[in-house]
Regions:
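Hydrophobic anchor at the beta1->P-loop junction of P-loop NTPases
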Residues: 9
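Conserved lysine of the Walker
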Residues: 17
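Hydrophobic positions on the alpha1 helix immediately C-terminal to the Walker A/P-loop
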Residues: 20
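Short beta-strand-centered segment that lines the nucleotide-binding/catalytic pocket of NTP-utilizing
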Residues: 31-47
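NTP-dependent small-molecule kinase module
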Residues: 159, 163-239
Length: 239
């Protein structure tokens, strides 16, 4: 039984992950691929509803998703203290265990591609990566966590990201972006997608997929949905 291709999308809030996931899943489905889309928060994270309620109650932040016409002042991952980092570290270990279970389940299911909206990387980027103990802990969790076939990190300009999704202070988003980039140096398999317009980001993702095809040429499902995609064919001819 052929195993599915695992693709993950990570990045700061407002980086455009949902847009690119929608576009990629739609194009792969149109090409005949059986695509499973998972939300790390909804499908992997342990006690997600309880954690959200507790965070709102204790940290007094607003709930909801921010939009240009409706800013939301969230207080959760942007609140930093040693005891919150300790609690997060404990919870992230549980999430890593859950991730392995979910990963094994979907390896055996009838899908060609499994796409994660966020991944364990998005949690680890909430920790202080400038701390030696935090980096050691992160390496431990990464060693224990499954490595996706294509882990994508969508980089973005923090100012534009906050305009698109006003939920956190700009200074925190700058700090969070640097944490993601630092995490990419700890885990070299992460592919950083440079900030750009939506079609240009699509092109960068496509190039990563085509490069992956060259490495995993033995994967029929992967080759099938790429070969059937008109966008992929035109891009391949220009590379």
């Amino acid at each position: 039984m052929k195993q599915p291709l695992f693709i993950t999308f990570s990045g700061i809030d407002g980086a455009g992950k949902s847009t690119q996931i929608d576009l990629l899943c739609a194009s792969m489905s149109a090409a005949g691929a059986r695509v499973t889309r998972l939300s790390f928060w909804d499908d992997v994270v342990a006690f997600s509803a309880q954690r959200e309620r507790s965070s709102h109650r204790l940290l007094k932040g607003e709930v909801g998703v921010g939009s240009p016409g409706r800013p939301v002042a969230r207080r959760d991952k942007n609140v930093r203290s040693w005891y919150l980092n300790f609690i997060r570290s404990c919870l992230y270990l549980i999430d890593a265990v859950r991730l392995n279970i979910v990963w094994r389940q979907h390896r055996r299911r009838n899908s060609d591609v499994v796409v994660f909206d966020r991944y364990i990387y998005d949690e680890l980027a909430n920790l202080p990566l400038n701390n030696v103990l935090s980096r050691a802990y992160i390496r431990l969790v990464l060693k224990f966590s499954p490595i996706p076939d294509l882990p994508l990190l969508l980089d973005a300009d923090p100012s534009l990201a906050v305009q698109r999704k006003p939920e956190y202070p700009l200074d925190f988003v700058h700090t969070n972006r640097q944490a993601y980039l630092a995490l990419g140096k700890i885990e070299p398999s992460i592919k950083v997608i440079a900030p750009a317009l939506i079609p240009e980001v699509q092109d960068q993702i496509l190039k990563q997929l085509l490069a992956l095809r060259a490495i995993k040429g033995q994967c029929p499902a992967f080759i099938a949905f790429l070969a059937a995609s008109p966008i992929a064919n035109s891009q391949a001819q220009t590379m």
